Amino acid sequence: MAYSACFLHQSALASSAARSSSSSSSQRHVSLSKPVQIICKAQQSHEDDNSAVSRRLALTLLVGAAAVGSKVSPADAAYGEAANVFGKPKTNTDFLPYNGDGFKVQVPAKWNPSKEIEYPGQVLRFEDNFDATSNLNVMVTPTDKKSITDYGSPEEFLSQVNYLLGKQAYFGETASEGGFDNNAVATANILESSSQEVGGKPYYYLSVLTRTADGDEGGKHQLITATVNGGKLYICKAQAGDKRWFKGARKFVESAATSFSVA
């Protein structure tokens, strides 16, 4: 009777490594978790009729052992190898979803909720753990408008809610200070404005840089998202000081403001 045996040795042949290094760069290689040498021996009995069967059995075991010992790289999945297509997708840990009354927004994960009330109709406020100048606010107020476009252009809308841009620390007449006009202690420059339809509703987006003569971090970058739904004006405002804006806060402010939507 014929039989075969296969043995796995955890050592690589020098000749095998040499052949692998000399093969064409266009060929696909299967990397091994450990160097594996596979040796199969087939014993032939006196029965000649069973010799072919023994050789086939040995080859089958050889292929099976090679498949078990190999480690498929992720790139091999493109060529038909098994892929972890049912694996859990990666989640963005930089933000946490917040579902409010009639709205939802992505909040930076390292920002804390705050009880400070700064604006009329404020229902939500989060602040940066290290700098309260970086914060997120959501305001909901009644309106007789049917759509955000009833306020006019994005710039005209901003002029009607300019209280969102903050208050200066000095009131009264001044000579020109820090490049400001006479009697002016604050400026607001609209860097960008746009209108976009989401879920069948128009939204206004504005990016504003405000500066005050009393010098607050050189200015604040304020991003505003606004829409109207069900007789209510929804406004989301996220901001960061100019210094932190360029040190990484920008992505958190922009992502939070643009994630805002109403139900």
Curated annotation (Swiss-Prot):
Its main location: plastid. It comes from Arabidopsis thaliana. Interacts with WAK1. This is Oxygen-evolving enhancer protein 2-1, chloroplastic. Pfam families: PsbP. The lineage of its organism: Eukaryota, Viridiplantae, Streptophyta, Embryophyta, Tracheophyta. The modification Phosphoserine is found at residue 153. PANTHER family: OXYGEN-EVOLVING ENHANCER PROTEIN 2-1, CHLOROPLASTIC (PTHR31407:SF6), PTHR31407. It is found in: Plastid, Chloroplast thylakoid lumen. One of its GO terms (molecular function) is poly(U) RNA binding. Belongs to the PsbP family. GO terms for cellular component: apoplast; chloroplast; chloroplast envelope; chloroplast stroma; chloroplast thylakoid; chloroplast thylakoid lumen; chloroplast thylakoid membrane; extracellular region. Keywords: Chloroplast, Phosphoprotein, Photosynthesis, Photosystem II, Plastid, Thylakoid, Transit peptide. One of its GO terms (biological process) is photosynthesis, light reaction. May be involved in the regulation of photosystem II. Gene3D superfamilies: Mog1/PsbP, alpha/beta/alpha sandwich (3.40.1000.10).
